[in-house]
């Protein structure tokens, strides 16, 4: 399982890459390994979202898994490439497999998330 050190992680297996007040969010390598081959991604709608709210889902041969907002803010972009090729989540969950981008309401929210070492300990 890969957990890049520059990201923040939720207990629901989402990752957050914060650059200024913009966060890119996806599901972790561990999550995609547990799900198996991703066949469909329900992408979130643009707009404001609260921390912890369900915003979409990932479907695989092993079942469905909800995606939750690990932080609050405004969803400003979705990865529409996943509609055509949801397997990007399996191939590269931290780059081409990102799910959405948001303008965070408070960048300090990431301090409530785990670092890579803590997340690796959670899933080991």
Regions found by a protein language model. Name each.
Residues 1-57, 64, 87, 91-124:
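Acidic, low-complexity mobile loops and tails
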Residues 13, 47, 69-77:
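Generic structural motif
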Residues 60, 80:
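Short, conserved catalytic or interaction motifs in soluble domains
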Residues 77-79, 106:
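Poly-acidic low-complexity segments
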